[in-house]
From Swiss-Prot:
Superkingdom to which the source organism belongs: Bacteria
CDD domains hit by this protein: Ribosomal_L11
Protein species of origin: Brucella ovis (strain ATCC 25840 / 63/290 / NCTC 10512)
Job of this protein: Forms part of the ribosomal stalk which helps the ribosome interact with GTP-bound translation factors.
One Gene Ontology molecular-function label: large ribosomal subunit rRNA binding
GO biological process: translation
Keywords: Methylation, Ribonucleoprotein, Ribosomal protein, RNA-binding, rRNA-binding
HAMAP family: Ribosomal_uL11
Protein name: Large ribosomal subunit protein uL11
PTM comment, free text: One or more lysine residues are methylated.
Family label: Belongs to the universal ribosomal protein uL11 family.
Subunit structure, as described in the record: Part of the ribosomal stalk of the 50S ribosomal subunit. Interacts with L10 and the large rRNA to form the base of the stalk. L10 forms an elongated spine to which L12 dimers bind in a sequential fashion forming a multimeric L10(L12)X complex.
Length: 142
């Protein structure tokens, strides 16, 4: 018989840096999830990823206090800021430019994010990422 789902929880945790301190510990603890067990499992699963990159994770927890989790790829904004060497986007997108990014870099980001995006092909994914870049104040060139 299948386990009864008690709920789901979305968190964004740096790769390889899950620990029981806030905000992870309280979010898991109040739902009855074993915090250390999750931290060990997440850190082991995110070992291959770039240390410190923010990883969106969807945790499904069950009534018997067990859990499963699904890790996604880092957010598009993380990739865009990394590609353009920025700390943050423009405070006034559309008016002040925060920097530029090439279409080749946009394609690389689209290919990396393809499994998480709701896009039929790489071209559609590139258009989505270009929209995110524009909303951050980045100019797409090339």
């Amino acid at each position: 018989m299948a386990k009864k789902v008690a709920g789901q929880l979305k968190l964004q945790i740096p790769a390889g840096a899950a620990n029981p301190s806030p905000p992870i510990g309280p979010a898991l603890g109040q739902r009855g999830i074993n915090i250390m067990e999750f931290c060990k499992a997440f850190n082991a699963a995110s070992q291959e990823m770039e240390k410190g990159s923010p990883i969106p994770v969807l945790i499904t927890y069950y009534q018997d206090k067990s859990f499963t989790f699904v890790m996604k790829t880092p957010p598009v904004t993380y990739f865009l800021k990394k590609a353009a060497n920025l700390k943050s986007g423009s405070k006034t997108p559309g008016k002040a430019s925060a920097g530029t990014i090439t279409r080749d870099k946009v394609r690389a980001i689209a290919e990396a994010k393809m499994k998480d995006l709701n896009a039929a092909d790489v071209e559609a994914a590139m258009r989505m990422i270009e929209g995110s870049a524009r909303s951050m104040g980045l100019e797409v060139v090339g």
